[in-house]
A protein has these predicted regions:
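A cross-family "folded-core" feature that marks the main globular domain of proteins
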Residues: 1-178
Length: 178
């Protein structure tokens, strides 16, 4: 792949072998790179295939995010996809990365947000909640910030919303009644 545009030191816009527009992420992948130069495959950590309508938003979000938040998000989404055994929406990367970034900022600023639905989330979406709890460990390892348990519930709901398998709506409908 060749560089189309350097977004920052860790993010490049390019095209894959199918001609699809992609964002390529990796530590230092964009450092001193210019359009037309080849991307070092050894530095590629993640490739995001872009839909036309999401390109600008993803570029803006990822260019302003610390690399640790992006890496934590990648690891969480990979773990969740395997654990849930289903495909998750690409928008999960955007939404979850943004959420994690602001949760870390709130935590550092001493601004807690209580998850009023935490008990219900544990009950109706226990698997997603357990993934959320593991996500807190991933975030701690990648960023050095331990987020409160309430955030595991918020992450669980991001996973539920990103699920591509909408066959079992009963738990969601039950939660909505509450």
């Amino acid at each position: 792949m060749q560089v189309d545009k350097v977004i920052n030191n860790n993010l490049i816009r390019s095209h894959d072998e199918k001609g699809q527009e992609v964002l390529v992420m990796g530590c230092g992948i964009g450092f001193k790179k210019k359009p037309g130069e080849y991307i070092d495959d050894g530095k590629v950590e993640k490739v995001y295939v872009l839909q036309k309508e999401e390109r600008q938003h993803m570029e803006e979000l990822f260019s302003s995010m610390p690399l640790e938040c992006i890496q934590a998000t990648n690891e969480i989404v990979e773990y969740a996809t395997i654990s849930l055994g289903k495909q998750l929406s690409n928008y999960l990367y955007l939404n979850l990365c943004d959420h994690i970034h602001f949760a870390i900022q709130r935590s550092k600023g001493g601004i807690p947000i209580q998850n009023a639905l935490l008990t219900e989330i544990k009950r109706f979406y226990n698997h997603e909640y357990q993934i959320g709890m593991e996500s807190l460990n991933i975030i701690k390892r990648k960023t050095g910030v331990l987020l409160p348990e309430d955030e595991a519930g918020f992450i669980a709901m991001h996973l539920v919303n990103a699920s591509m398998d909408f066959q079992d709506l009963a738990p969601r409908q039950e939660l909505m009644k509450l």
